[in-house]
Amino acid sequence: MKDIIVQPNITIRQAMKTLNTSGRKCLVIADGKNKLLGTLSDGDLRKAILKGAGVGDFIHDYYQKKPTVLVEGQYRLGEAKKLFTNYKFDLIPVVDDEGKLSDILLWERIFKNANSKLNKKL
């Protein structure tokens, strides 16, 4: 998962390359001390470019600074599933009490068993 964690001082081009390489739809932005700063989706990048941003511009003006997060030890699997299905999230950052990134929940990890059951029925 480290391949989708980036610092806020990268360019839009670098973010696009990271998304492309990772195969994800969203990146997690954290500082050098692993404090969560936000998320940046492929949609955020499209909106930035449509507003006139260049691929050489830095992402700090375009990422979501108040993303949906779950707090370590304070959420249930059902809550995570509801967030994923209601908001079509690709991932949800999990932070500790100090706001440091402790995990990243990925859609396919949460719904792995559901997909297996569906494939068996088909």
Stretches found by the model and what they are:
Residues 5-24, 30-31, 49, 70-89, ...:
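The conserved cystathionine-beta-synthase
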Residues 118-122:
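N-terminal glycine-rich phosphate-binding loop and ensuing alpha1 helix
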Residues 1-4, 57-67:
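Bateman (tandem CBS) regulatory domains
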Residues 24-25, 36, 51-59, 75:
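Phosphate-interaction motifs
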Residues 1-8, 42:
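N-terminal intrinsically disordered, low-complexity tails enriched in polar/charged
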Residues 21, 28, 36-50, 93, ...:
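Short beta->alpha transition motifs characteristic of CBS
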